[in-house]
Amino acid sequence: MQADLYPSRQEDQPSWQERLDPVVYRSDLENAPIAAELVERFERDGYLVIPNLFSADEVALFRAELERMRQDPAVAGSGKTIKEPDSGAIRSVFAIHKDNELFARVAADERTAGIARFILGGDLYVHQSRMNFKPGFTGKEFYWHSDFETWHIEDGMPRMRCLSCSILLTDNEPHNGPLMLMPGSHKHYVRCVGATPENHYEKSLRKQEIGIPDQNSLSELASRFGIDCATGPAGSVVFFDCNTMHGSNGNITPSARSNLFYVYNHVDNAVQAPFCEQKPRPAFVAERENFKPLDIRPQQYL
């Protein structure tokens, strides 16, 4: 077991530490699958939005399959869904790269996974995948957090060599609850307060209350770095570092949001025992044993 380089949830007062790991693991930017300045932007800000990476026809295909799964009683009863805390409507369906042939192919699409492979510097596997819905009028907010804090403490992910990829299936506009991020926050790790409860994921995936930063830390991060919204038309893709501070507002507009979400982790950064006193989260939330490196290649869907 590796040493705990990013402790959290151990003290009664929050604290900060500087990031110990690179953000971009390759320096040969001339060989990057995207423009060098985009890689440099990811290094600086901790996220990147690439508009129109997928075509309108591809998005329509993905949305049709997403809606089919959303209405499938077998999916609803699979134990791999998260529902809105008030309405009971499906918010997320997990493990789509394992349970759905189409979305398994999307996980290995060179347009997205190839970028992740370059940034992380080698072979990848999918730590987590899901499709997300934020309905119009009733979509709830999700509070500020660093994904890595949870993946480290509750899943045992040793280092910051992981990133998320969100494929937008609807237009993300400032008014309909898009992802908000603090540019530059990924270079600072906020140690949170509060012991991890048993089976915490059952509640935290609906509304996280443990493993969230204190308000003073959030205020300081926002003061230093500001807050940006990841907006773009359907077919755009948002890449963001595992430690970038992010969250989203509720959606009280008629404009629903949905996306496909893949977490790419380097194979050398596979999870181990959690850095807390609880058992690991289930595999549909955090892949632990049955993974192999992605066979990243161009994909044809139409």
From Swiss-Prot:
Optimum pH is 7.5. This is Ectoine dioxygenase. SUPFAM superfamilies: Clavaminate synthase-like. One of its GO terms (molecular function) is iron ion binding. 2-oxoglutarate binds at residue 134. It catalyses: L-ectoine + 2-oxoglutarate + O2 = 5-hydroxyectoine + succinate + CO2. Its cofactor is Fe(2+). It comes from the Bacteria. Its EC number is 1.14.11.55. The record marks 151 as: Important for ectoine stabilization. Pfam families: PhyH. Fe cation binds at residues 145, 147, 246. Optimum temperature is 35 degrees Celsius. Active from 10 to 50 degrees Celsius. InterPro entries: EctD, Phytyl_CoA_dOase-like. Binds 1 Fe(2+) ion. Involved in the biosynthesis of 5-hydroxyectoine, called compatible solute, which helps organisms to survive extreme osmotic stress by acting as a highly soluble organic osmolyte. Catalyzes the 2-oxoglutarate-dependent selective hydroxylation of L-ectoine to yield (4S,5S)-5-hydroxyectoine. The keyword Glycosyltransferase does not apply.
